[in-house]
A protein has these predicted regions:
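Conserved ABC ATPase "signature" region
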Residues: 88-107
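Catalytic Walker B motif of ABC-type/P-loop ATPase nucleotide-binding domains
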Residues: 136-140
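Helical segment within the ABC ATPase nucleotide-binding domain
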Residues: 150-162
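Hydrophobic anchor residue at the start of the ABC signature
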Residues: 125-126, 153
Length: 197
């Protein structure tokens, strides 16, 4: 399997269940052993730190974990801070700014387990982008969100794509084809189809 991701890419990854979409994402993230190579552009690193943000499918997040919405967002900085360093006032301001941008600032202080599925997905998006990654990987980001926020989500992602490459897994090729720059079909093999957008 071979796939090049360029710095301004916005890729929609589609394919049947069991075709390898999640395995492809997990290989890019370095979360599973794989045969072959995953090459990262130098721009994806700051020193030895990988600049990759990830929004998993919501069902992998423990809603019982005792953490506030703001703390959830700030946890996206953990790999980017020194051990035992505290969040700065600027970090907290940035977290609140992202919560406002995604329309959930009013739940900033609530426990993550007390908010709706759509609000959870927005909070996890904020967590994925607070570190300003160079590559953002999203696994079914429109799950659990209403139609109004789904449209806003795609606008936010198009705005973010000015600063980072995006890889988005989705089952809804009809919707994402009008948003992404290229479609990647994964069914044990990878086929990239660039659009004329």
């Amino acid at each position: 399997v071979s796939l090049d991701i360029f710095e301004d890419d916005f890729l929609g990854v589609i394919g049947p269940n069991g075709g390898g979409k999640t395995s492809l994402v997990r290989a890019i993230l370095g979360n599973i052993p794989y045969r072959g190579t995953v090459n990262y552009a130098a721009e994806l690193f700051r020193g030895k730190e990988r600049l990759i943000g990830y929004l998993p499918q919501q069902n992998v997040f423990d809603r019982a974990f005792p953490i506030s919405v703001t703390e959830t967002v700030l946890s996206g900085l953990q790999g980017h801070k020194r051990f035992r360093s505290r969040y700065t006032a600027e970090d907290c301001r940035r977290a609140l700014q992202l919560l406002e941008r995604t329309g959930i600032a009013e739940v900033a202080g609530r426990a993550i387990g007390e908010i709706s599925g759509g609000q959870m997905q927005r909070a996890l998006l904020c967590r994925a982008i607070i570190s300003e990654p160079r590559l953002l990987i999203l696994d079914e980001p429109a799950n659990f969100v209403d139609n109004q926020f789904e449209n806003e989500l795609y606008r936010i992602l198009q705005e973010l794509n000015r600063r980072m490459a995006i890889v988005m897994v989705s089952h809804d090729v009809g919707t994402i084809s009008s948003v992404v720059k290229s479609i990647v079909c994964v069914n044990r093999h990878v086929h990239r189809h660039d659009s004329n957008i």
